[in-house]
Amino acid sequence: MSRICELTGKGRQVGHNVSHANNKTKRLFLPNLQNVTLLSEKLDRSFKFRVSTHGLRSVEHNGGLDNWLLKQSDTKLSARALKVKRELVKASAA
């Protein structure tokens, strides 16, 4: 299971631990991923995603999953999120 947010594309970053003596050792900074169930109001269904807490705050800030997916570019979304976005576009067109 990859450590990438399904909605924002946020993944791991590489950096250093720096000691008091300025010795540097490589380390990973992992995103805070949570398994969440988000409700789509237009589709009247819920979807499970593995989302970073940053992504979850962004979804809530934009007024829910539907608005977030319609605003977000396709390149950052996972395959499952893209599928939901296509369903939303199809439902809103009908």
Swiss-Prot record:
GO CC term (a single one): cytosolic large ribosomal subunit
InterPro entries named among the record's database cross-references: Ribosomal_bL28 (IPR026569), Ribosomal_bL28/bL31-like_sf (IPR034704), Ribosomal_bL28_bact-type (IPR001383), Ribosomal_bL28_sf (IPR037147)
Domain of life: Bacteria
Molecular functions per Gene Ontology: structural constituent of ribosome
Keywords: Ribonucleoprotein, Ribosomal protein
GO BP of this protein: translation
Family assignment from sequence similarity: Belongs to the bacterial ribosomal protein bL28 family.
Protein name: Large ribosomal subunit protein bL28
Organism of origin: Novosphingobium aromaticivorans (strain ATCC 700278 / DSM 12444 / CCUG 56034 / CIP 105152 / NBRC 16084 / F199)
Biological classification of the source: Bacteria, Pseudomonadati, Pseudomonadota, Alphaproteobacteria, Sphingomonadales
Underlying gene: rpmB
